[in-house]
Design a protein with these regions (language model features):
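Alpha-helical transmembrane segments and terminal signal-anchor/GPI-anchor hydrophobic tails
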Residues: 47, 52-56, 62-63, 79, ...
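Short hydrophobic/aromatic helix or loop-helix immediately within or flanking a transmembrane segment
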Residues: 52-60, 67-90
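Loop-to-helix entry region of an early transmembrane alpha helix in multi-pass inner-membrane enzymes
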Residues: 76, 88-105
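Transmembrane-helix signature of polytopic, membrane-embedded enzymes
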Residues: 108-128
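Membrane-interface alpha helices of multi-pass inner-membrane proteins
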Residues: 130, 161-185, 201, 281-285
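Short acidic/glycine- and proline-prone juxtamembrane loop motifs at membrane-interface regions
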Residues: 135-141
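Membrane-interface transmembrane helices that cradle and orient dolichyl/undecaprenyl
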Residues: 147-161
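Signature aromatic-anchored transmembrane alpha helix within multi-pass, membrane-resident enzymes
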Residues: 317-339
Length: 383
């Protein structure tokens, strides 16, 4: 019911504020949705496949120095944060409340600052990103949040402040190292030829996948990465998946975002987040060869939402189409995309339980209900 309330409220908000362009009560709706998203995350109980691990980590009553030694593979920022919240009674729940407030506020504020169609973007965030960020990758979610805080400095090319906040990201998750290279896109010409050249470069990487795999393997086979690299590269389920990627996924995740950037550039309306969309496409291309790299797009998925929303909203067609036609395209495009992406929640995760059982039905800390199917998935994923 809690998910349904958020969904209905977002549909109403999209109609009122994104389609009809109403202003009255817009802030009220925005903050009501934010509070609901925070509450759902903060008061959740055993939701998400990594939840048990985090709950156990906070439950360990080790002395601080023992905790640091036992969990030496964790990043320092996370270790310090966990140690701090262990000073409170029920540390995990106190932490989760802080986490939910911080991460969801940062995400929604980023949405507000980067697209005109705020509630459409929040709907896509809720469906495609929210559950992973709030119930799965808590450490990486904090790293993503610090990256999003650095965006306004990146846009202004204030690289000193950008890298200071990036350091905070790395303190929570080593995957944030991929953000070191994002400013390099400013060295590239902002021309259509660059965007199509980028697409060609990615496709060549996919075509010569064995050579790319060999190169990346040896880049990551250094002391600070070797253990994790071996773990991910040698597991069968992280192996080659190029043949399993459908033509629709190629189109949606490679051709479409670059085409949308090209169209925006042609009209001199290249969005300020264009370099993050380019990073998204490169990482998606690499992840076709090495699927584990797909997790790096946790930093950039939100920008795909921005470019998609801005594109189908009619920005690129407004000189040729009527207002009602633009609205129709917007609704149809949003509906088709959401419908296609939603199918991932219905795929079987352990051969018998659909993926959505990790999050539905909802269970709160007030009733502490354990869902049988969810517990089966927990055991399957954590064995």
């Amino acid at each position: 019911m809690s998910y349904f309330i958020v969904f209905i409220l977002l549909i109403i908000s999209i109609y009122k504020f994104d389609i009809r362009n109403e202003i009255r009560f817009k802030k009220v709706y925005f903050y009501c949705i934010l509070i609901l998203l925070i509450a759902i995350s903060a008061f959740s109980y055993r939701i998400g496949s990594d939840t048990i691990h985090y709950m156990e980590e906070f439950a360990e009553r080790k002395m601080q120095y023992e905790y640091f030694i036992i969990n030496a593979e964790r990043q320092p920022g996370w270790l310090l944060l966990v140690s701090l919240f262990k000073l409170f009674p029920h540390p995990y729940y106190v932490f989760k409340f802080f986490f939910s407030c911080f991460v969801n506020t940062v995400f929604l504020q980023t949405i507000k600052e980067n697209t005109k169609y705020v509630f459409s973007a929040i709907l896509m965030y809720f469906i495609f990103i929210y559950f992973t960020i709030n119930f799965e990758i808590l450490r990486e979610a904090l790293a993503v949040a610090f990256f999003l805080l650095s965006l306004k400095f990146l846009y202004k090319r204030n690289f000193m402040t950008y890298y200071m906040l990036l350091f905070c990201s790395i303190m929570f998750h080593v995957s944030a190292l991929c953000l070191l290279f994002v400013p390099l896109f400013y060295l590239m010409p902002q021309k259509r030829s660059f965007f199509y050249g980028l697409l060609l470069f990615i496709m060549l990487g996919i075509l010569f996948d064995e050579q790319l795999r060999f190169l990346i393997y040896h880049i990551f086979y250094v002391d600070i990465f070797s253990e994790k690299a071996l773990y991910y590269f040698e597991k069968e389920n992280f192996g080659m998946t190029k043949k399993n990627i459908g033509i629709i996924n190629y189109f949606l995740n490679l051709f479409l975002p670059i085409f949308m950037l090209s169209c925006a550039n042609k009209q001199n309306k290249l969005p300020k987040y264009w370099l993050c969309v380019c990073a998204y496409c490169i990482i998606y291309g690499v992840s076709i060869v090495l699927p584990i790299f797909f997790r790096f797009n946790n930093y950039f998925n939100i920008f795909y939402i921005f470019i998609f929303i801005d594109f189908i909203s009619g920005v690129n067609f407004k000189k040729r189409l009527s207002l009602n036609s633009m609205r129709l395209i917007f609704v149809i495009g949003l509906t088709l995309f959401v419908s296609f992406k939603l199918k991932t929640h219905f795929s079987l995760i352990d051969g018998k339980n659909p993926s959505y059982v990790r999050y539905y039905p909802y269970s709160s800390i007030f009733d502490k209900t354990r869902n049988t199917k969810r517990e089966q998935v927990f055991r399957y994923l954590n064995n």
